[in-house]
Amino acid sequence: MSQTTSAHNEILQGPILSPLIRFTLPLMLSLLLQALYGAVDLAVVGKFSSTASTAAVATGSQMMQSVTSLVTGLTMGVTILVGKAVGAGDFQQAGRIAAGQIKLFSAVAILLTGLVTVFAPLCCRWMNVPANALAQTIAYIRICAGGMVFITAYNGISGIFRGLGNSKSPLLFVLIACIVNVFLDLLLVGVFHMDAAGAALATVAAQACSVLFSVLYIRRRPLPFVLARESFRTRGCVLRIAALGAPIALQDFLVNISFLMITSVVNRLGVAESAGIGISEKLFVFLSIIPMAFMSALSTFVAQNMGAGQPERARKSLLIARRISVVFGAGIFLLTFFGGGLLAAIFENDPAVIAATAAYLRGSSLEYLLTPAIFCTLGYFNGMERTPFVMIQGLASAFLVRVPLSYLLSLMPGADMLVISLAVPISAVVNLLACLIYDRHLCRSLSPC
């Protein structure tokens, strides 16, 4: 509780750079561990199983990421509202928001479990999953769907902590999950050769352990508010969470669907290309950790400062985060352009898969120069409760640029992974332009910039 109070005070007063970095670093480590969490499945299966199993885990994990994005999007609504309540010093309201989240997320977990289990085969066929990987992909998705309750619980608890200004506790929760997942992956896939199903079972078990640990953690270190019965009787908080989180959830989900559509286009090229684009998407999660962490940090920073009536401080935090992220983005651009093959070799031994992955990374490398500014600006918009714009720009760039352009490029004579991947940085340019234009408009409406 004292850790939460200290972090809250740093966010609202004093220098910005130091507390912003202190808050962001645990988020970076959390994202790194989450990326490792998913990548370990792919790496272990790639080393101990067939290429078909690798394609199954790559495609199946992409589908589950799309579903999970609905939960993480709603979680952002919780983080923003808790942050704003804490910034205003209203911890009772923060408790009501947490109670509303529990009600909403319980319903979401049940609904998603049923839908994913039933429609897994249809989704796999729609994505043109190679025939020799179809059965394993369906099994992977259905097993992971059985752990949806743990996914929603973990995200919900972590969202509350981040809204309070505490990014260290969620890091501890995901560390537990990562350790359990690595151990079980090596056991179930490496020793018992359970292929994609073993990787899925390891994932679900790790998530369950993480949630159990987080509940025990809260019992020993209570939150700075009480979840009283009266808190659960307030319906307005559920609607507010949905109003703020639903646009982000819908945007994240449909943008993930757009990448699945691109995967569907690539899957027609063969199993090696199918595995290659799956590995490329896994690498994106690793390589975008810094801007994604700043995006999450800014959502809390901005929400708390707006709740405290300090819009100028919120604006300064955006400018600082954007500068830091862009510097790192330049380094990632060079790495993906020149070292894609080395990155791919971490996950796969097959030379054809490595070549396909390297080609896709080279073509999409320019994206890593642009996403730092995009993600930081979106985090600022989230904290300002401008989530409808976040949704609109994301959907426009995905479905008006990225998907149709990928399809058109795939129809070109001799089209390969390099050619198709060019749609990604082109859509990122559209993203950035939209964000900068809206940011300028928002800045002028608040105060002279």
What positions do the PLM features span?
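Transmembrane alpha-helix boundary and packing residues in multipass membrane permease domains
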Residues: 27, 31, 43, 80, ...
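Short alpha-helical transmembrane segments in multi-pass integral membrane proteins
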Residues: 1-24, 82-149, 191-246, 302-367, ...
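Small-residue hotspots at the loop-to-helix junctions and early N-terminal turns
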Residues: 49-62, 137, 141, 200, ...
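Short runs within selected transmembrane alpha-helices of multi-pass transporters and secretion channels
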Residues: 75, 144-162, 170-178, 199-214, ...
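Small-residue-rich hydrophobic transmembrane alpha-helices
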Residues: 54-114, 118, 151-170, 277-340, ...
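Helix-terminus/linker motif at the lipid-water interface of multi-pass membrane proteins
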Residues: 36-55, 124-131, 187-194, 253-286, ...
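Transmembrane helical elements of multi-pass membrane transporters/channels
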Residues: 22-41, 143, 154, 177, ...
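Residue-level signal for short hydrophobic patches within transmembrane helices
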Residues: 13, 17-36, 40, 63-70, ...
